[in-house]
Amino acid sequence: MQGTVYKSTGSWYQVKAEDGKFYECRIKGKFRIQGIKSTNPVAVGDEVSFDLEEGVEEKTGVIKKIKERENYIIRKSVNLSKQTHIIASNIDQVFLLITLNNPPTLTTFIDRFLVTAEAYDITAVLLFNKVDTYSIEELAEVKYLAELYRSAGYECIGISAKNGKNVDKVKDKMIGNTSMISGHSGTGKSTLINAIEPALDLKTSEISRQHSQGQHTTTFAEMFDLSFNARIIDTPGIKGFGVVDMDREEIGDYFPEFFERKQDCKFHNCLHIEEPKCAIKDSLEEGEIAWSRYKSYLQIMEGEEDNYRVDQYQK
């Protein structure tokens, strides 16, 4: 039988078969995909072949094969930094929810996420949530960040998942697509999904006052069919985002504003760090490229882990 993985709980996978029915499936033994060393060999969004288990009253299956993925979002695993975790696969676009506070989303985190989306050719849209709660100063900061990322080529939308502001814009972008929603815990992922499709009635989190972080309400990634010809993947809140398996020479290509200028560098293999006559560094000095983006680039190049607790908005 053929189907698509809608939910993964680590050991069991909920698969929607071509007949529209859901089956609880598992994998037997060491199930590894060539070229990918991840903590989860099967991910939400995977298209799989599975066999129903004989002699079992409840309809359970065993996954035999995974169809080649069109793309996936991957990051370093939480517990084992050398291992990776595939968040979801076969995605048309990803929405990254960003909040200025409660919890803060830093540019280092945003940039690492965007680099991964670029590397796997997934369209990313930045959603600045909770705009209804911000002061004039905070709204100015949102405007600054939105302009920064728009100048790098990304679509940015200010929303309020709670009062519905611009939720229709997000919904329109989802029609006909499989979309993934990501961000820190407490940025409003489940609230946004409920605003888009109230019938789902997902559990939402309260913010921990002590740490300004959201409490995890989504433990495992899960995909939902929506009533307007769309699918959405809800993902667990993530703290840091480790970039996986990229050569130093290619990292700059995943910053769109670097890529479009690199042909003007003196050296074709310019890494935009110490080389003379570098178009990226010239653009940086001229204010055409944001310092925060360049700092993120240097951190990724140096292999530094994302420190989401340190304020790095400033130069």
Curated annotation (Swiss-Prot):
A GO CC term attached to the entry: cytoplasm
Main location: cytoplasm
Top class in the EC scheme: hydrolase
GO biological process: ribosomal small subunit biogenesis
Keywords: Cytoplasm, GTP-binding, Hydrolase, Metal-binding, Nucleotide-binding, Ribosome biogenesis, RNA-binding, rRNA-binding, Zinc
EC number(s) given by UniProt: 3.6.1.-
Gene Ontology MF: a single term: rRNA binding
Cofactor(s) the record lists: Zn(2+)
Localisation: Cytoplasm
Pfam family, one: RsgA_N
Ranges of residues in domain CP-type G: 80-241
Residues that, per the record, bind GTP: N129, K130, V131, D132, G183, H184, S185, G186, T187, G188, K189, S190, T191
Manner of cofactor binding, per the entry note: Binds 1 zinc ion per subunit.
Record NCBIfam families: ribosome small subunit-dependent GTPase A
Function: One of several proteins that assist in the late maturation steps of the functional core of the 30S ribosomal subunit. Helps release RbfA from mature subunits. May play a role in the assembly of ribosomal proteins into the subunit. Circularly permuted GTPase that catalyzes slow GTP hydrolysis, GTPase activity is stimulated by the 30S ribosomal subunit.
Family to which the UniProt record says this protein belongs: Belongs to the TRAFAC class YlqF/YawG GTPase family. RsgA subfamily.
Subunit structure: Monomer. Associates with 30S ribosomal subunit, binds 16S rRNA.
Name of this chain's protein: Small ribosomal subunit biogenesis GTPase RsgA
